[in-house]
Amino acid sequence: KYTYMKNHYFDNINLGDERLLRTPVYESKLDDYFDKQLFQIPDSIIPQVDFLMNRILKQENKGYEGKMYYNTLHHLFMKYQNPKYMGLDNIFVHIMETYYINGHVPARVANDTAYMNKIKDRYAKMVHNQIGVNAVDMLLYKMGQDTLDEHMGWTRLSLVKSNYIVLYFWDTDCGHCKKIIPEWHKLYRENEFKKKG
């Protein structure tokens, strides 16, 4: 039942009819489909984005200049650039790589360098911060056994050899951080974690 619905949800909608864009029906159908009918994981949503976009291209028959094509693409782009659930930003990255960066957008969009530079900048910030993707290497202070020791040079995070690496980002003005950091420090000093590196 799920597979049938997923593949036939838009069967009775003429995806080539741009008049639908002037009604609330089409956008609410898109939101219902991507929010409620599909599993909320990138592996389920990404193929359906491509399936829908290809179907619109065939039915609208105007290439990348079609209004249904671009309005649907833009709606999905806006929906997933700030997703509700962690991990769904992979969909935004996929849309950027497959459609915007490869030029599968209307010429007026592709030629708008200010807009394209802005969204490419957003893409560049997100592409290495996805779940399951290696983070950009970080340059770190090399410290002695005690944090009060003098600075001992620089190292890269990728050069740290350990089974586990815990990176803890905190703010000096954070009240909760002021309480929890001494507990982390105590846990590190008194347990086997220090011996294991």
For each feature predicted by the language model, list its residue ranges.
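Oxidative protein folding and maturation machinery
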Residues: 1-148
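Short, conserved, surface-exposed binding loops centered on an aromatic residue
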Residues: 128-130, 156-160, 191-193
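Active-site lining segments that contact anionic ligands and/or coordinate catalytic metals
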Residues: 135, 161-164, 195
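Conserved helix-loop functional segments at active or binding sites
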Residues: 144, 172, 186, 190
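Short active-site neighborhood of thiol/selenol oxidoreductases, capturing the structured segment around
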Residues: 150-184
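Structural microenvironment flanking redox-active thiols in thiol-disulfide oxidoreductases
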Residues: 178-197
